[in-house]
């Protein structure tokens, strides 16, 4: 038999393959291309955006990747290499579970990249991880469309590129944990199709289980979509002939397979669910499910065009762009006569469900777990892109059903153009602007550029449809279209990166590497100096999660996976707490000491946050990002208590401490802990009759200038006069002792003011030479906390001045601030020293510890209970003298341990709730998967392989018979000598339709 010329869409004969490696490459080179093409495209975009190593200073850190996630990667890297624990972490909010953070942010298999690569290139490893996720998304989508839609290899590259470079994928490089959704979604969808078509189950179970483990949040969204896709494919998508009983049987088995998915992922799902139940579920308060729409439907039109980045804040629109090739093929999908009506109905169902989910606010909230997302809206929009590209692929694979004419092509182009013109006319009513962080549409680079691309793709589709029988021509046109699609995707990515930078800014490499390395180095030196278990903090911040990278055990932290009990307590003590973010602003010796903050690192620029009574221990010199010599100094708090200590058991009379006045809360905490609070039992209720005060309130006089004062509920509204030049609120008070004075301003409506202080008076009796107080601002960012005013000689008169800020860009705008209470308190160090010394007498002497285990001895006296400043949450196993005991919750924040009088050995060990059960179900799930493969899927695969073999044999016989017929015809005409039979064979091969379906492949 004559040999065949190898066409790009033709099977590769064994004799042309050479060795096994070449055979493998011949079969899979287009899959490799689907992986590497998006990687190269994003690298080109990064290079033009000056990301390192193409630029000197650029990094991929932006928004939460800069402020949160990079630190989580640092922490999980420490845990992997033995410097921490996967279960528990001491660098967050006084400590807390870590599996929730892993499951919410870090459980992706791609996280191994930053874990295994050197820490010195962690930013580059994050970029490599991003690239690998986008490349793998291209690969998995290529697998999906070649198996499901039977598209040819070269043409699959067009659409795998469009999918992997969708707007969602490019923009969410700043939230890389969500990219796993676009990686595993095609495999899950293919698994559903395999299950319905031929009964294979493992292809559904394994990718969905991995997705549930990789990211709990996106896994939840894919779970919803899985149900929708199963419904679509069972009733509309499959070509299998099913009976009524088949629908019931398959649905029952599908449910069983989903249970196996949950069994295999329970070791992650259960701990994550526990972590979320500590506060995330209730974080946003009672959700508002009242009906409302979120945009005009026509506003989705530019979302299908390139360069359509709106915003990552709550004004943003759904990120559904996935290439103009997809946009132009969508109307052709419904015009295609080769696509059956049931598939059109089914895909329309999916599009409608996803559209109305985005359009109707309560439906949108359900996709986000019943809450309105904080920035980054429509986090499931990649599902729409998946559906749209799938529709485009189906249309392209059946171009013969369109019978494209110039009229049809022109009609599609004019139809899209008409919609564009309609939107452009309506755009002023949508209040878009072209600068700033509000949403906007660039008419030229979105619509003009998009319509040019639409014209190119429509012309390409027209010529492909007219040359269906010429494989070489089709391949050339497809190759050109792939190049154009790639250029479009690359330019769109670069445009998105620039607009992200304009809105929220990318961080520089040195701003991270220099600061974090210096912090890790000084922490290592501190560990050498004192290797015991203690807490430490710092007075400076790159971001609030620095402690995770430094390895410091502190209170500063930011995460969506929060323990609201402990962050509320941190606020109660007067530290900074905003939303779910806590920071070491607002510290006092009393709070620091009782929470065990033994060391504080200072960079000599934030003296307002450093207590003057703390003792310097050592200094560490380094160079900052500007190559300037800098010094970090470590200070010791001489009164810091252990992680656990004995207190008076009357503490159990307090349910919690209020957050209206942090000084009262601190007074009550230490007073009750030392037995100095008097309680009365009246009619079954326990009342507070008095307590010791370590802070006493100072009398204040309030005066204003250029300000109107009016009541605002139980608060006071201070409004600047219309012609005000310097609207101020003056607070006057007198120092009673030489101890520190502290300030806290209470409000329910934060509006920033500038803060000043003076204790100097001029000859006219007015205060002069005001200096900045604290950070210079209050009610701004993290500056809503206790502020140390300073220490003064007794009798010194002091003025604290608040300046209401005027708006220079909008001078007519009414400016104001609202304050409920001006709290100025005098600290009494002698009383504090007296009582902190009592607590020092019975501390937990820790002899052994790691991140999830603590062991030590402690001596209890009659009427005492052991207080640990470890946040109260399930998972701790506590033993006293080898016997398990049940803890009690103290102040709705901490773990308390009842002890009998005497000396005891107390051990605590943490295991995430549900983890052990999850490991058991994982083992069972894997065993069931193996059984399913051996008893079911293996046989199905063998049967499909046999069918494939028979089909290939039949095709070979048909080809051989056709060639013999041609040869006989040639010989009968006596033209053998003048005709190249091999060329005739090749012509016959090339006449085959490159778009024909190969059902056996699926």
Describe the function of each predicted region.
Residues 38, 130-148, 153-238, 250-273, ...:
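Membrane-embedded helix bundles of polyisoprenyl
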Residues 63-76, 109, 250-253, 257-337, ...:
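Periplasmic/ER-lumenal interhelical loops and adjacent helix-loop junctions
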Residues 218, 345-365, 371-515, 903-952:
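Contiguous transmembrane helix-bundle modules in multi-pass membrane proteins
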Residues 484-513, 524-595, 641, 647-651, ...:
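Extracytoplasmic/lumenal acceptor-recognition loop(s) of multi-pass membrane glycoenzymes
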Residues 39-141, 161-182, 221, 276-283, ...:
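Membrane-interface coil-to-helix junctions
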Residues 1-52, 249-253, 459, 475-481, ...:
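Start-transfer (signal-anchor) and selected internal transmembrane alpha helices
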Residues 72, 686, 690-955, 1001:
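Active-site-proximal, structured, solvent-exposed surfaces of multi-pass membrane proteins
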Residues 13-98, 501-504, 509-544, 548, ...:
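Hydrophobic alpha-helical membrane-insertion signals
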